[in-house]
């Protein structure tokens, strides 16, 4: 019995949910998502990274955008630099949020794709998690052989 881990490519997610590509470095569609959960990076944009899992899809909604909007340009760049340096697979902007120039510059520097959707943050979070739970569910592959033998007649 062998348990195999699975991944979902960003290209598959873009196709499945019709995400807009705001920025995508060369070959980003092949990036594999291996975690079946997502994160809203509000605490990380405020500077708190304890227990942060950088392997999750990061979804930035209106709350995070409003917080970042109140920062100076230099501080915005610093916060996005710190987030992208962790190696997150993608930043997804919900509600058709405009990308901050500082966010785009930091993403380009670190090669982090930025996607966008018009869906509400909570809606797209739940839909993505449900999709990933199915696609990344553990599976077992068994190899077997069935052999039938008839009893030999005894005298």
Each language-model region and where it sits:
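Short secondary-structure boundary/capping elements
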Residues: 71-75, 99, 139
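Conserved small/polar residues in nucleotide/adenosyl-binding loops
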Residues: 148-155
């Amino acid at each position: 019995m062998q348990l195999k881990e699975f991944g979902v490519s960003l290209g598959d997610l873009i196709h499945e949910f019709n995400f807009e590509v705001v920025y995508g470095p060369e070959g980003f569609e092949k990036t594999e998502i291996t975690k079946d959960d997502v994160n809203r990076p509000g605490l990380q944009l405020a500077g708190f990274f304890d227990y942060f899992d950088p392997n999750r899809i990061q979804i930035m909604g209106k709350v995070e955008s409003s917080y970042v909007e109140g920062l100076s340009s230099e501080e915005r760049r610093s916060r996005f630099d710190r987030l992208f340096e962790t190696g997150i697979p993608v930043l997804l902007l919900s509600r058709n949020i405009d990308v901050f120039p500082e966010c785009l510059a930091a993403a380009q520097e670190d090669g982090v794709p930025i996607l966008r959707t018009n869906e509400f943050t909570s809606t797209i979070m739940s839909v993505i998690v449900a999709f990933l739970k199915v696609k990344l569910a553990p599976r077992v592959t068994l190899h077997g052989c069935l052999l039938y033998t008839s009893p030999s007649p005894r005298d």
